Amino acid sequence: MERRQDDQPASAARKLTLLVVDDNQEVGESLAMLLEALGHHAVVVRNWQMAVEQVKLCVPDAVYLDIEMPGISGIEIGRRLRHNPETANAVLIAVTGHSLPMYMDDALAVGFRHFLVKPVRLEDLATTVQSVLAG
């Protein structure tokens, strides 16, 4: 029996392009593997310069940003992405090892939609992906 295209699950209908920015390669790769297990395409970069170059190649649907990185914070990268017309609509998701309210407040003030604490649970990632898909 042939399967019709509209019989596919809703999540398979749209494959998201997701950018992961984390200075820790293992953490970034792990996050990307989980996002890909959810059926989406994830690209990992290790610093803000690489993030800027990557968004020139392909504008992501969402950006998972480590909050504490050498040289520039994920909050500042998020602020810059918000002011760039090409990435102004990308969903920003903060990823950090800190659950202090000040980090969350700073992220939300810049326009981050979600705030995840490491280690990130698959269920929490799935929630962020569903939020991006819902618009």
Q: Where are the language model's segments positioned?
A:
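Two-component/phosphorelay signaling modules centered on CheY-like receiver
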Residues: 25-43
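Active-site residues of response regulator receiver
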Residues: 66, 96
